[in-house]
From Swiss-Prot:
Pathway noted in the entry: tRNA modification; N(7)-methylguanine-tRNA biosynthesis
Family: Belongs to the class I-like SAM-binding methyltransferase superfamily. TrmB family.
Example GO molecular function: tRNA (guanine(46)-N7)-methyltransferase activity
Gene name of the encoded protein: trmB
Binding site for S-adenosyl-L-methionine: D56, D81, D108, D130
Organism expressing this protein natively: Rubrobacter xylanophilus (strain DSM 9941 / JCM 11954 / NBRC 16129 / PRD-1)
Protein name: tRNA (guanine-N(7)-)-methyltransferase
UniProt cross-references to HAMAP family, sorted A to Z: tRNA_methyltr_TrmB (MF_01057)
Keyword Glycosyltransferase: no
Length: 223
């Protein structure tokens, strides 16, 4: 979905109390100059407890991560997205379910690496990231060597990373980087998987499936 279409999304912002409960906003200036003053991506810093933490990068309107939070109340979940209106919908979804174990951060994840903490994450989800269709945008793709390096530092040994894309070119890049990296073990014998049928699908997944796009997937484990 293009940013223009996302910009036309009609959604009412949460009231101040609800926003304070669920939402954090980090500007690029804060992340670049004041990262040490911001809470890190860990359960103690975000939730004040020691529960396992799972991270959804590019969570959109929150269908998938809210399902995860409902299904596992003994863990914490944080969704990151750059688009505030999408997060407003995600917050409404969390509020309607009265979820106590979820927060959302409005920020550019590429600037959030200083907030990662060693072995703080049980799982990371990167589902349907922006492929940057135009050649000049491809160098800005989130999934790259730096992403793999930072996730290896942040994910606990035995933790996992789930990667899903409908873009064949992005998939080929992911496959090449994973095979070259060597620090992650596939949770499946095949080089990759096709199809993705979670109990709750995001609006992006539904949209691409309606268009008949092939979905490529990797499930990785940090040894």
């Amino acid at each position: 979905m293009t940013r223009r279409k996302l910009g036309r999304m009609k959604v009412r912002p949460p009231d101040p109390e609800t926003a304070q409960r669920y939402l954090l906003r980090f500007t690029g200036r804060q992340l670049y100059h004041e990262a040490e003053r911001l809470p890190g991506l860990s359960s103690p810093e975000l939730f004040g407890d020691q529960r396992p933490l799972e991270l959804d990068v590019g969570c959109g309107t929150g269908e998938y991560i809210c399902h995860l939070a409902r299904s596992d109340p003994e863990a914490n979940f944080v969704g990151v997205d750059l688009h505030l209106k999408s997060l407003h919908k995600a917050i409404r979804r969390a509020e309607e379910a009265n979820l106590q174990n979820i927060k959302f951060i409005c920020a550019d994840f590429r600037q959030m690496y200083p907030l990662l903490r060693p072995s703080a994450l049980r799982a990371v989800y990167l589902h349907f990231p922006d492929p940057g269709i135009k050649p000049r945008y491809r160098k800005r793709r989130l999934f790259n060597e730096r992403f793999l390096e930072e996730m290896h530092r942040a994910v606990v040994p035995g933790g996992r990373m789930s990667l899903v894309t409908d873009d064949e070119d992005y998939f080929r890049q992911m496959l090449e980087l994973i095979e070259r990296d060597g620090r992650w073990r596939r949770a499946h014998e095949e080089p990759y998987l096709t199809g993705f049928d979670p109990p709750v699908k995001s609006r992006f997944q539904k949209m691409w499936e309606r268009r008949g796009r092939t979905i490529y997937r990797f499930e990785l484990v940090r040894p």
